[in-house]
Amino acid sequence: MLFQAGVVAGGAPKAIERCRVLLDAIGRRIFLAGADPAAAAAIKIANNFVLGCAIEAMGEGFSLTRKYGVAPQVFYEVLTDGLFAAPAYKVYGKSMVDESYAKLCQMAVLGLKDANLALAAGEAAGLPLPCGGRLSTR
């Protein structure tokens, strides 16, 4: 296995089955999105969109707690020891504690692409995505 990410596959079941060995080799788990390949793309975009919104909210949480004199490490520990113990919160939260913004800036550029794709997909579906509007203007 090359990496630990899951692979989202969309398309005709026979086509996915033909690719199964490759999909199993590159991901820890295969998620079947259905017969429409666009569904797999929507999942990928939505996944990164949610991550971008989470990073934005986390940054605001760090800013708020700093304004009240809370040490960033304390907020980080509270945040990642409970409901937000997921790797994304631990990795990006640690970058905020350490004020190592280079990684966050790099991810923001990549995240902006998917935020804009999510906004376009939402617009095409007649679905407003208010968090995405914030991400695309930051």
Regions found by a protein language model. Give the residues of each.
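Short beta-strand and adjoining strand-loop segment in the mid-core
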Residues: 2-24, 30-33, 46-54, 62-68
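Short glycine-enriched loop/turn motifs at secondary-structure junctions
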Residues: 1-3, 102-103
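Helical "substrate-binding/catalytic lid" subdomain
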Residues: 37-138
